[in-house]
């Protein structure tokens, strides 16, 4: 009995100490760790590497895992966050397609055996996957802009075709769509229950993986949507430049950027040694192996946990993978420093950004069309937009990456509108070149829409130098 009483006494004492400790922390009588800049961890914009959760030195395997974006528990996101007196007006979503089969094969090796049929009880799983498959099977009469109407609405090959979307890719975008549904529809009522076709704007390139990714996100966002209300427009260019694709100066920037990439590769003796070793394993000339872009296929093996290929001469291994991935990371770092890609990005991203602000400006006038815009695209679409916005530290677009522009109206001052920019759920608005100094100049909590409009209409051309003040002049500048 005495032992039992002592045990109960100790238990009560422990509970009391825990309560006191939590109370002191709540009232900030015990200091809690805060970042050096004084911001709380909740408000800190995590576009920069987080020293607590990320390796102190760049780790190629860690970066590759982030790139794979393997579906897991629901992620935390900052979409839809604004002061209570702001009303959400429109949302503009740019996505990279989900996980896909490689575009290239390592010469003389067996293709990775990945099943591109959709199976509801196979990992990765999503609660809406079976319903998605059923709904897609009813969409054969969907009316899309040619040539999209000739593409399959979902992946369905026991052995994936080159570049085909995988089940992982479908699940990634079902998750994206459901997350956006919870925030924009359930919380902010962006669209009415009886939404109409003209309240959506949907555009995709002519690849099955982008159309299917767009449909997966759309199904997560608007489950069991009416096929008669869905119309995807076809975009021939990965830059989504529509009728403004001819731009000689942009092409010159790209040529110089590709030259920079080539020279950096030549300087990397370890990379050349690795390519040489791999070429011997598969018994092809080093030049042929390099041209096959082996990292594309190796990433598929890595993301799907499939062994790297072997021949009688040996096996491609993780060390080879690390060397090539490390070079990719170094290439991205030098790309930011040299600014050639930045020049390419300003001109490459201008048409799609110009379309976006035009759509936003129409929404500020009270127009109810195109309140939700979705561009289903590629890494080579999102990467220039990120660079042009000044988000130089943003990671290269992972599978199923999402970049979102939100337009908000101040209910207390209805004529004033603001924007938020989010990348993979992180609020990066105040990292953009057009709003990074906003808090120094204004007490307003949100970035004014005028900042983005001025950036697209004027500042993008100023950043290029020269005397051009519009897209045509900047694209045809002499003496570049």
UniProtKB/Swiss-Prot annotation:
Residue positions the entry lists as glycosylated: 305, 354
Activity versus pH, per record? Optimum pH is 5.8.
Which keywords, in A-to-Z order, does the entry hold? Glycoprotein, Golgi apparatus, Hydrolase, Membrane, Signal-anchor, Transmembrane, Transmembrane helix
Extract one GO BP annotation from the record: glycosaminoglycan biosynthetic process
* Catalysed transformations (reactions): 3-O-[beta-D-GlcA-(1->3)-beta-D-Gal-(1->3)-beta-D-Gal-(1->4)-beta-D-2-O-P-Xyl]-L-seryl-[protein] + H2O = 3-O-(beta-D-GlcA-(1->3)-beta-D-Gal-(1->3)-beta-D-Gal-(1->4)-beta-D-Xyl)-L-seryl-[protein] + phosphate
Question: Which EC number(s) are documented for this chain?
Answer: 3.1.3.-
InterPro entries, alphabetized: His_Pase_clade-2, His_PPase_superfam, Histidine_acid_phosphatase
Query: Where are the membrane-spanning stretches?
Result: 7-27
Task: Supply one GO molecular-function term.
Answer: phosphatase activity
User: A cellular component term (GO) from this record?
Assistant: Golgi membrane
Q: Does the keyword Thylakoid apply?
A: no
At the top level of its lineage, which domain of life is listed? Eukaryota
Tissue expression summary: Widely expressed. Strongly expressed in spleen, fetal liver, moderately in placenta, pancreas, kidney, thymus and colon.
Please indicate if the UniProt record lists Signal as a keyword. Answer: no
Residue stretches in coiled coil: none
Which of the seven top EC classes does this enzyme belong to? Answer: hydrolase
| Membrane side Lumenal: residue ranges | 28-480
Q: Where does the record place the catalytic residues?
A: 97 (nucleophile), 379 (proton donor)
Biological role: Responsible for the 2-O-dephosphorylation of xylose in the glycosaminoglycan-protein linkage region of proteoglycans thereby regulating the amount of mature glycosaminoglycan (GAG) chains. Sulfated glycosaminoglycans (GAGs), including heparan sulfate and chondroitin sulfate, are synthesized on the so-called common GAG-protein linkage region (GlcUAbeta1-3Galbeta1-3Galbeta1-4Xylbeta1-O-Ser) of core proteins, which is formed by the stepwise addition of monosaccharide residues by the respective specific glycosyltransferases.
Summarize the subunit comment.
Interacts with B3GAT3; the interaction increases the 2-phosphoxylose phosphatase activity of PXYLP1 during completion of linkage region formation in a B3GAT3-mediated manner.
Name by which UniProt lists this protein: 2-phosphoxylose phosphatase 1
Q: Give the originating organism.
A: Homo sapiens (Human)
Gene encoding this chain? PXYLP1
């Amino acid at each position: 009995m005495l032992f039992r009483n002592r045990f109960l006494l100790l238990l009560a004492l422990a509970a009391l100490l825990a309560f006191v400790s939590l109370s002191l922390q709540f009232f900030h009588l015990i200091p809690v760790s805060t970042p050096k800049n004084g911001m709380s961890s909740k408000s800190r914009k995590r576009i920069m590497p987080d020293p607590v959760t990320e390796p102190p030195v760049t780790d190629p395997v860690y970066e590759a895992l982030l790139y794979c974006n393997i579906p897991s528990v629901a992620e935390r996101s900052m979409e839809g966050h604004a002061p209570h007196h702001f009303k959400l007006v429109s949302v503009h979503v740019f996505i990279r397609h989900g996980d896909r089969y490689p575009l290239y094969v390592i010469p003389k090796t067996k293709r990775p055996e990945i099943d591109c049929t959709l199976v509801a009880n196979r990992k990765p799983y999503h609660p809406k996957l079976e319903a998605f498959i059923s709904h897609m099977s009813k969409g054969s009469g969907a009316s899309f802009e040619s040539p999209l109407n000739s593409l399959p609405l979902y992946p369905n090959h026991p052995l994936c075709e080159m570049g085909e979307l995988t089940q992982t890719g479908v699940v990634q975008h079902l998750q994206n769509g459901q997350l956006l549904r919870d925030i924009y529809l359930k919380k902010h009522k962006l669209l009415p229950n009886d939404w109409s076709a003209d309240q959506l704007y949907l555009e995709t390139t002519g690849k099955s993986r982008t159309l299917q990714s767009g449909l997966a996100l759309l199904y997560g966002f608007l489950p069991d949507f009416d096929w008669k209300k869905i119309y995807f427009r076809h975009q021939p260019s990965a830059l989504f430049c529509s009728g403004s694709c001819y731009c000689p100066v942009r092409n010159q920037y790209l040529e110089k950027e590709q030259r920079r990439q080539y020279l950096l590769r030549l300087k990397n003796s370890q990379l050349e040694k690795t390519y040489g070793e791999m070429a011997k394993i598969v018994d092809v000339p080093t030049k042929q192996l390099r041209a096959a872009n082996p990292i594309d296929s190796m990433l598929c093996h890595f993301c799907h946990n499939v062994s790297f290929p072997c021949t009688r001469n040996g096996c491609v291994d993780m060390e080879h993978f690390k060397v090539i991935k490390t070079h990719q990371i170094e290439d991205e770092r030098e790309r930011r420093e040299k600014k050639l890609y930045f020049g390419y990005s300003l001109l490459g991203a201008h048409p799609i950004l110009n379309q976006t602000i035009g759509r936003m400006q129409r929404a500020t006038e009270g127009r109810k069309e195109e309140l939700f815009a979705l561009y289903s695209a590629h890494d080579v679409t999102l990467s220039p937009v990120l660079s042009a916005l000044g988000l130089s530290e943003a990671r290269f677009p992972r599978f199923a990456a999402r970049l979102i522009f939100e337009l908000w109206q101040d209910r207390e001052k209805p004529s004033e509108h603001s924007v938020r920019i989010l990348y993979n759920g992180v609020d990066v608005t105040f990292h953009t070149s057009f709003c990074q100094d906003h808090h120094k100049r204004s007490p307003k909590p949100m970035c004014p829409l005028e900042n983005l409009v001025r950036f697209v209409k004027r500042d993008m051309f100023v950043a290029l130098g020269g005397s051009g003040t519009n897209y045509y002049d900047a694209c045809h500048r002499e003496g570049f």
